[in-house]
Every structure is written in structure tokens, then in C-alpha cells.
């Protein structure tokens, strides 16, 4: 059941960081930065660990490559979605860069290809359907 709240509650809130569980931050950094073109936003010591935050090429919410969440083992992130303006172009480029990606699939919500990072975290690269 929905709860009614003040109309200003969380009015300015947005998702800014999504944690991606990895086993090796350096290997993951090479994949996300060198292979996918993400930009490093922060790479700094963090409570005896390493805070590694990246932004996708088009901006928007960032990802943090994490090793410390006990209930998020490496490879457990599923259903992550990156939106693109041309999934077929990007699928061909992924293959050229050595990334295994499924053949593009058409669905009611757009055309997508699925890929995985070195730990097995699952991403969809999605091209939204053209508006009528």
C-alpha cells in the first residue's frame, strides 16, 4: 500500500552512485575505463580501502567499483542498463574491443545487447524505441 507523504519529500533526490561488486579493482578499472570508455571521477583511499568511482561516457549516475560488501559478492550485480543511441554500432564496437556481447534483441522497451564485466556483472546496452 502506498504511503502519502509531503509533496517535497525527496523532490530533489536522484540516484548518483551504483555500487558494482568486483574482485579486482584494477582489472575492473581497465575494463570500464579502457574498454568501455568510462571516465574516472575519483580514485582515493577510503577507510583503509579504495574508492573508485567512474562515469559513463554520456554522464549521468556514476558507478563505484567495490570490494567490501559481504552480501554483494563479485559478479552479483544484474539488470544494470546503459542507454545508447545506436545499439548495433556499439555492439560491433564491443566485439571489436574483445567484449563478448549477445546479438542485439528487439523487445517492447527497445533493442539491447547483453554483456558482462570480468567478474560477471550483467549489463544491458539498450537503445530505446523510436517515438512514433
Where are these regions (language model features)?
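Short secondary-structure boundary/capping segments
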Residues: 7-10, 43, 53-55, 69-73, ...
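Generic structural signal for helix capping and beta-alpha/helix-loop junctions
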Residues: 50, 111, 130-132
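Vicinal oxygen chelate
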Residues: 22-26, 57, 73-74, 79-122, ...
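Alpha-helix boundary/capping residues
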Residues: 35, 69, 97-98
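N-terminal beta-strand motif that seeds the catalytic metal site of vicinal oxygen chelate
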Residues: 1-29, 60, 77-80, 129-132
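Acetyl-CoA-dependent GNAT
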Residues: 44, 66-68, 106, 126-131
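A short, structured beta-strand/loop element
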Residues: 62-64
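Core segments of cupin and vicinal oxygen chelate
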Residues: 12, 19-60
Amino acid at each position: 500500500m502506498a504511503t502519502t507523504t509531503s509533496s517535497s519529500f525527496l523532490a530533489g533526490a536522484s540516484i548518483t552512485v551504483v555500487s558494482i561488486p568486483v574482485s579486482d579493482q584494477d582489472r575492473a578499472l581497465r575494463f570500464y575505463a579502457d574498454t568501455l570508455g568510462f571516465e574516472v571521477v575519483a580514485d582515493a583511499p577510503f577507510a583503509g580501502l579504495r574508492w573508485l568511482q567512474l562515469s559513463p561516457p554520456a554522464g549521468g549516475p556514476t558507478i563505484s567499483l567495490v570490494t567490501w560488501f559481504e552480501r554483494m559478492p563479485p559478479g552479483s550485480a544484474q539488470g544494470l542498463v546503459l542507454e545508447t543511441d545506436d545499439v548495433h554500432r556499439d555492439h560491433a564496437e564491443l566485439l571489436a574491443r574483445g567484449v563478448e556481447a549477445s546479438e542485439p534483441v528487439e523487445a517492447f522497451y527497445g533493442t539491447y545487447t547483453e554483456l558482462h564485466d570480468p567478474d560477471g556483472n550483467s549489463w544491458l546496452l539498450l537503445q530505446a524505441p523510436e517515438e512514433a
